[in-house]
Amino acid sequence: MKTLLLLGAGKSASYLIDYFADLAQKEACQFWIADLSVAHLEPILARKKGIKLIPLDSGNMTQRRDIIQNSDLVISMLPAFMHPEVARDCVDFGKHFFSASYESDAMRALKPEIESKGLFFLNECGLDPGIDHMSAMKIILEAKQKGEEIRSFKSYCGGLLAPQSEDNPWKYKFTWNPRNVVLAGQGTSRYMDQGELKLVPYHQLFRRVDEVSFVGLGKFDGYPNRDSLSYRSVYGLENIPTILRGTLRRQGFCRAWDVFVQLGMTDDSYQLSLPEHTTYRQFLNAFLPWDEAKSVEEKLADLIPDFDFPTFEKLQWLGFFESIPLPKTEGSPAQLLQHILEQNWALESEDQDMIVMQHQFEIQTEHGIKKITSSLVEIGKNERHTAMAKTVGLPLAIAVDLFLQQKINLRGLHLPVIPELFDPILKQLESFGIRFTETVIES
């Protein structure tokens, strides 16, 4: 019986944990779960056979390597920066490796050793990246097999609130790592538009948004991800005139978030040490010019040209115009902002999250241009069984299960962009209700 080791048991791992806990009950595997804190899993998994909970600081190399050495296959749901170390351990001990995170240069450097040892390493098999790759490649390969040419490909994804839980003006709460949300978009975004390279620096990013619509849900803002260009080779679209990968937020979010960007409140490059009783209002005012005759609100309106009422309402709801003491007074501006947002954007136990993803293709056929819009909407159940956890964890769990059943017989370093991987995974995802709806317009 194979021993599966899961490293990391955070919010995004709940469906994956349930999946393999069920397999362990059927004596299909031994399932070890290692995390800095496993106490939250004890009430859920207590008395279930075939499951072992292991308190582990994954930064402790000796302890981590010992556990990996005694397993057969490793699934990493750790922060992405730890994957190269875990992957190195897996290569050293001859263990297969699976993750939902982006494949790094450090991971690619291990490719010769992975291949020489006959191991299977699969990365980018979650939601974004993951389901986005698989669903897009299915359409891309079908078009190529017909001799059609893909002229434009845009893909957007967002982790948001279900409509019934949108109880604040931002229509947003944290459904994944808050720090990643606060720092999102820093750097320069690159994509292709009608054969031209487009560069979007951070200070313009949240002003350069596309309108993306979903049937029954309305309109969203889509802003470009940092790197769309590298996916030309991943998708076999090296000469495509237009390619863009982006992130979705509810309409109006980006305009309001841009206020924080323009003021410098998302800067993570330096540390502040503010007086102990500094308020939200004083924190905001620190980023505004001095003017004895004007209020914080007036100075903000002067500094931000398109500071409209919906944007004002969003900042007001967060408490930035009130004398509320800051939860933390030491840290970078981004860290202090994050602490404020965590108090306002925390998911409540009754909240439901939502995943939205949309691919937009323009394909040249022998008869003209065919436009395909392929959309996915997934609503979470509750605080533990979120749409994010479902769409991140299930593709990874299914891939591991297919590998254990020898329905995946590949070796080497892979992404789920080939039919041997994406066809069976997408088919299994449909059995869990994760499926895309397509509209096709031909002209």
Protein language model features and the residues they cover:
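Oxidoreductase and adenylate-handling cofactor-binding alpha/beta cores
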Residues: 132-150
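Conserved Rossmann-fold cofactor-binding substructure of NAD(P)-dependent oxidoreductases
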Residues: 58-70
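Helix N-cap at the beta1-alpha1 junction of Rossmann-like dinucleotide-binding domains, i.e.
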Residues: 36-40, 104
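Rossmann-fold cofactor-recognition segment
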Residues: 48-60
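ADP-ribose/adenylate-binding Rossmann-like module
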Residues: 89-107
